[in-house]
Amino acid sequence: LDRRRRRPAKELAGRLLAPAFLGGLFLASVAGASALAALGDAPIRGMLWVARTADPARALGSVPTECLKIPADPALAARIEVGRAAFRTAVLLGGQAGRAGINCETCHRNGRTNPDFLFPGISGAPGTADVTNSLFSTHRGNGIDDPKPIPDLAGPKSKLKISQVPAEKKLEPFIHGLITEEFDGPEPTPAVLDGLAAYVRALDPAACPAMARQPLGVGLLMADVRRAMRAAQAQAASGDAATAVVMVASARSRLGLIDERYAAPALARPRAALRDADRRLAEAQGALREHRADAPELLKAWLARSGPLEVELNAGQKASLFNPALLSQAVRRRLPG
């Protein structure tokens, strides 16, 4: 076991957490500059935690297929959708991890593992993470470098650390500790915590598609956006505005993953449409927080306009960093060693 003392958390934080989010989207700070120049040498934030040895087309241009078993029970399926959306937003974790743009899916891509994850000061070999690092946690930091392999949450349940048997109720406190202690995150709403446990339990190796990976593109991310927004609608209808706000945050996070790949000057029009869509989501979040009567209508209206938005984004996808050739050019600029 490598028990080297690690670098101080503040030293790492200053270098890794400098880029800022505005309106839920990762925005270039230099107006009018080209995509690569505006975002320095890491136009896609995920490049900051991908090993230099990784195949960019696989690590940044595709994702593992999701092994999610959707139950016949509509109530349980709705809980799973809440957890699925929360799993994909940095708002859940908060703290330094949230400010770095990290969420559960950063390490567990589509609920799986991430063999290419290499976060400076947190990882040892690619695909490992030190969950007791004081950069992310003031509660569990132990001052010792001890990264462990990232588990595949869709692997055999018997190989996972915590029992997922619902009657044993071991998974919920474990996830709560991960959020509030391991990542210094805010207290999750009861529905979010319950949903996360339901989502993790629904990840099943028997539900894995025949195709191991799928291309990452506008269609996949917009599907995630709509699922999160439908979960927001359901939570708002039930009177749980706080959980609905988290669902909208997840939708905004997925739009952000599209936005950062549309930074080329030629994509100004679809990028403007993205920013307008994000502005309308921010308005819906505000309405939910204020318990305004127009919140449900704002959510409904956003979903109604999501189809034309996707059409416009698809039209520009070949000129974006979803294009494997352009992605490879961008990646050659920088990957951490």
Where are the language model's segments positioned?
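Sensor of tandemly repeated, compositionally biased sequence architecture
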Residues: 11, 31-32
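Periplasmic c-type cytochrome electron-transfer domains
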Residues: 4-6, 32-337
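Bacterial N-terminal signal peptides that target proteins for export
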Residues: 5-21
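Bacterial N-terminal signal peptides
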Residues: 18-31
